Curated annotation (Swiss-Prot):
Organism: Xanthomonas axonopodis pv. citri (strain 306)
Associated pathway: One-carbon metabolism; tetrahydrofolate interconversion
Protein name per Swiss-Prot or TrEMBL: Bifunctional protein FolD
GO annotation terms (biological process): L-histidine biosynthetic process; methionine biosynthetic process; purine nucleotide biosynthetic process; tetrahydrofolate interconversion
GO cellular component, as recorded: cytosol
InterPro entries: Aminoacid_DH-like_N_sf, NAD(P)-bd_dom_sf, THF_DH/CycHdrlase, THF_DH/CycHdrlase_cat_dom, THF_DH/CycHdrlase_CS, THF_DH/CycHdrlase_NAD-bd_dom
Function: Catalyzes the oxidation of 5,10-methylenetetrahydrofolate to 5,10-methenyltetrahydrofolate and then the hydrolysis of 5,10-methenyltetrahydrofolate to 10-formyltetrahydrofolate.
Keyword Amino-acid biosynthesis: yes
Family: Belongs to the tetrahydrofolate dehydrogenase/cyclohydrolase family.
Length: 303
């Protein structure tokens, strides 16, 4: 069954991630074209997929299409189920040393690999275009923008397409994953928000109160309908990162969309909200990594 994005009510305006991502990709293509016209190397992105998980294959296909659209050269590494951690580590070492590769993407989860963090930490931080390496997250914590985690950075871009201020607002993040919730808190702190993070140990009454107080609500848990739409503060901006497939084949988020759309000023659809922005931001990071590599190669960068 093909999922389609829900339509917002008259109360809320849709934050159309597909449209905004396309605009971002169009601008990135101009950057790549200008780079190549100036005689610089075309940005190169290594895409590593292990096994044949259908969801992972779809995500990787979307990323490869985006790379082709903007003119990034994608180097595909489709590895069989059962590929060992040692084999992946050896591949990462090769990619780290390859000057044609400016970005390395390891599609998660990695089947049969109990601790993917060891492999993430093996990636050269300058090629970590997912923004997951501890060094890059540390730079974000210090307000030193470099390669930032893609989903939070994409959400910041989405927020910039609303008519709502960010600075001085109350922001609530539900979910504290290393790849979304935690760096999202850093992004919103840097943007000037007062940030509340909720997680599995947050008492239900505190969760509800935190959601009701949020001018900006970001939910990234992966549980359909976790946040009732009736909890949404009138006039809030709702960013629903969750994507969940129901038994009837529909894709839904973590927030009750219909009720939330009656109260929010802006809301992301599921699908078609955050996901396309994550992919577009990955391309943005890859181009920035290529630009930074050129500075380092010229002798003006810090190695």
């Amino acid at each position: 069954m093909t999922a389609s994005a829900p339509a917002a009510s008259a109360s809320a305006r849709l934050l159309d991630g597909r449209r905004i991502a396309e605009e971002l990709l169009d601008g990135l293509k101009l950057r790549v074209d200008a780079r190549v016209a100036a005689g610089k190397a075309r940005p190169g992105l290594a895409v590593v997929l292990v096994g044949g998980d259908p969801a992972s294959s779809v995500y990787v296909r979307n990323k490869r299409r985006a790379a082709e659209k903007v003119g990034i050269e994608a180097f595909d590494y489709d590895l069989p189920q059962g590929t060992s951690e040692a084999q992946l580590a050896s591949l990462i070492d090769e990619l780290n040393a390859d000057p044609k590769i400016h970005g390395i993407l390891i599609q998660l989860p990695l089947p049969g690999i109990p601790d993917a963090n060891r492999l993430i930490q093996r990636i050269d931080p300058r090629k970590d275009v997912d923004g997951f390496h501890p060094q890059n997250v540390g730079h974000l914590a210090l307000r030193e923008f470099g390669l930032r985690p893609c989903t939070p950075r994409g959400i910041v871009t989405l927020l910039g397409h609303t008519d709502q201020p960010v600075r001085g607002r109350n922001a609530t993040i539900v979910g504290v994953s290393n790849h979304v919730g935690r760096p999202m808190g850093l992004e919103l702190l840097i943007a000037g928000c007062t940030v509340t993070s909720c997680h599995k140990f947050t008492p239900p009454d505190v969760l509800e109160a935190s959601v009701r107080n949020a001018d900006i609500l970001v939910v990234a848990v992966g549980r359909p309908g976790l946040i009732p739409g009736e909890w949404v503060k009138p006039g809030a901006v709702v960013i629903d990162v969750g994507i969940n497939r129901l038994d009837d084949g529909r894709l839904v988020g973590d927030v009750g969309f219909d009720a939330a759309a009656q109260r929010a000023a802006w809301i992301t659809p599921v699908p078609g909200g955050v996901g396309p922005m994550t992919v577009a931001t990955l391309m943005q990071n890859t181009i920035e990594a290529a630009d930074a590599a050129g500075i380092q190669d010229s002798g003006f960068g810090i190695r």
